[in-house]
Structure formats: structure tokens, C-alpha cells
Amino acid sequence: MFYDTDVWPQLDNESLWIYDKLILSRKLGYKCGPCGVPVPYAADYIVRPIINLEGQGKGTEKLWIEHDTWHLKFGYFWQEIFAGRHLSIDYHKGSQLRCTEGFREQKSFVHFTRWILVDEKPKLPLIVQDITTQYDDVNIEMIGGNVIELHLRKNKDFDDGAIEVIPVWEDRQNSKPENFFYVEDTDDERPRLGLYKRYE
């Protein structure tokens, strides 16, 4: 399966928390809370939907919050901000398949400019490690070594052996890079037209 919208209807009730980013964050010990729960101190926080099956960071914002959070949208939550590299790791039946690093536009949580294959095996919290052995395919998103999302499907963009991928967005202009091949890859979940791919 390639889409979270396909996975959700088949999940058992005990596993639904995997797609609940607030519960996941709480289980991992992050500073977080739903709309209405005050923040522990005044700072910038990441605010995003508790559940977002469409993915790609949609609805995510960085907001300065003094204390109260009643002004946030219902169904959203706040969480401490993590800095560092953005990694996407695929597992199949408990074994790591690949690890990729993503680079996005500085002011956007949606538009990634490229993804590259990296030779790394990030250490996972035990609760997340257990998930990788319970399902055939698991994709894990991390920032600065902190797990931020779980998906019970894989990242299909690198299945064909690509080592670098550049998304082509419908609202961005891309010129074809040298030594890359264009692959049309439109879908209903993301506003992208295709991918430029580079192979060894």
C-alpha cells in the first residue's frame, strides 16, 4: 500500500494511535498538547492537525504561543520544535530497507526540494521499533533524531533504485537537472506533477 487513506480502514482499533500525532508525541515524551491546553512556556511551537492522512505537512505552522492555546484550530495540537536533519526511513518486516534525507524550502512545511539516499541506520525508541516488527511496511519520519510521524506503508519514490529525487510541484518552476530522468507521478494526495530521478 502506498497511501495512508488505504491503510486506515484496515487498521484494528488498538493501532489507530499510530496515526494520531498527538498521542504519538505524548508516548514519546515530547512537550505537546491539544487545543485548549496551555504551553509550558512562551516560545515558538509547531502546530498541526492531530490526524492528517493526506500527509506532506499540510496544515502545519510555526507559531509563537505565550500561554493559552484556545485560539488554535480544533483538531490541532501544539508540540515543541525539533531542529536538525529530516530523515525518512522505510522498514519491511522489521528490517530497514532504506533511509533518505529530505530538504525543504525554509518557509514551507509542504514543499521539499529534494530527497537523497543516505547510508544510515537511525536508532529508534523502543515503542517505535516494536511497530516496525508488527507490520509489513512502516515509514518513519524523523527530525533531529526525533520521531515525528509513523506511516504503515512505504515510500514508493525510491522503489526503482533511484538515489536522488527532486519533486516537481504544480505551483513551482523546475528545470530538468543534468543526469536526471523525469517520471510523471501525479496523485490526489499531493499537488505534484512528477519527479526528477537520478540513478547510479
Please state what every model-predicted region is:
Residues 2-126:
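Active-site nucleotide/adenylate-binding loops and adjacent lid/helix of ATP-dependent enzymes
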Residues 56, 105-111, 115-200:
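ATP-dependent carboxylate activation and anion-phosphoryl transfer catalytic cores
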